[in-house]
Amino acid sequence: MSETAARIQTPYLVAEDELDRSLRPRRLVEFVGQEGLREQLAVAIEACTARGDALDHLLLAGPPGLGKTSLAQIVAAELEVPFVQTAGPALERKGDVAAFLTALEPRSVFFVDEIHRLPRALEETFYPAMEDHRLPITVGQGAGARVVTLELPPFTLVGATTRTGLLTTPLRDRFGIQARLEPYAPEELAVIVRRSAQILEIGLEDDGARAIAARSRGTPRVANRLLKRVRDYAEVRMAGIVTAAAAQAALTMLEVDERGLDRLDREILHAICSK
């Protein structure tokens, strides 16, 4: 069964997706950590809103699970503009890019996840769109071919990447705002765990939040995943409250060690060190 079919037919997976979406912050004030980036975005958003302009194109880099997609959605929410999302691998032909760009409303946020996986041949399609809000399209073939230039509304391209080095310099330089998200401190992750527990209506003690945060490898996505697994353990084996003891017991059962590494992580590290 394909992943798409499984998601259509399995209510549990759909419910899990809905839960994950409900944990995403919706406004900058709700976003924990990355203080410098939050301030930079707040200033840029307020300035472009006052001018009535589209926000400069934004490149968000960093490891998976740090909040790049959430920030892109937050930018659109703060600007009160439409949010359109796709991914680099999904754009295979110039027609795919043209279909998205020509459908954008003024000042829309167009989010391209994994932008480093965008085919090189398509990068040049973005250059005039990003700089001049124009999209040259070749109509016809052979000697009768001609170029028609489509006018585009001002928009903001938000690119997310885990591998900045794979972006070409011409594409990277066209992003007016470039930022890198860094791993979160344990205290920040504890705040995120407490917020998620409140949304999910999980009984949580502060020491339980800190215990989960300490093993989350600096990543909110990991913290939220561990919180849900510890919740399950606390409901079945404990009194239903996520305490430090419940977190310790649950994470031991899951074979997650003090550094946040599970058994597969340790096996991979062992294999690397054994070479």
Predicted segments, located by residue:
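Pre-Walker A (pre-P-loop) alpha-helix and adjacent loop at the N terminus of AAA/AAA+ ATPase modules
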Residues: 15-63, 98, 207, 212
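AAA+/SF3 P-loop NTPase mechanochemical coupling elements
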Residues: 140-160
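C-terminal helical "lid" of AAA+/P-loop NTPase domains
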Residues: 209-215, 221-236, 267-270
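Walker A/P-loop
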Residues: 46-88, 98-106, 127, 162
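C-terminal engagement/docking regions of AAA+ P-loop ATPases
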Residues: 2, 7-13, 22, 245-275
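Conserved AAA+/SF3 P-loop NTPase catalytic/coupling segment centered on the Walker-B
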Residues: 75, 94, 108-138, 164-174
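Conserved AAA+ ATPase core "coupling" helix
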Residues: 166-214, 224-225
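Short amphipathic alpha-helical elements of helix-turn-helix/winged-helix folds
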Residues: 44, 233, 271-275
